[in-house]
Amino acid sequence: MARQGETCGAIIGAMAALNLVIGREKIKDSQTYQAAMIKAIELHSQFKEELKKQFDFTDEIRNSTCRYIQEKIYGRGFIMTDPKEREAFEAAGGHSEKGCPKVCAVAAEVAARELSELIKQV
């Protein structure tokens, strides 16, 4: 997020959407927090599984950091705060339909599926 190579902004957005639906309203509501955390963990796992499937990765996705996902897709991570590295990212297909936009689509798809199921329960 914010070109830092840390947690993928797409999954952060998916988690934020999930929290809007099932998150707690009061900080002391630990029961709601625990229930939401279970769903967030499930969403994160689904995101990694769907990335593996849609990008035809053979091994497991270990985490959801941007740099790690870049390594999986392009064979290397990029330092996105460096203009030359951003150019290399673009040249590698970073914003092509098989790059970052596809990762964002995976996160949106997984979130939409989960949120749809939650809304049906209401």
Predicted regions and their residues:
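Conserved phosphate/anionic-ligand binding catalytic regions in large, soluble enzymes, centered on
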Residues: M1-A16
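Amphipathic alpha-helical interface segments
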Residues: I12-V21, Q31-V122
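Active-site-proximal mixed secondary-structure blocks
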Residues: E25-K26
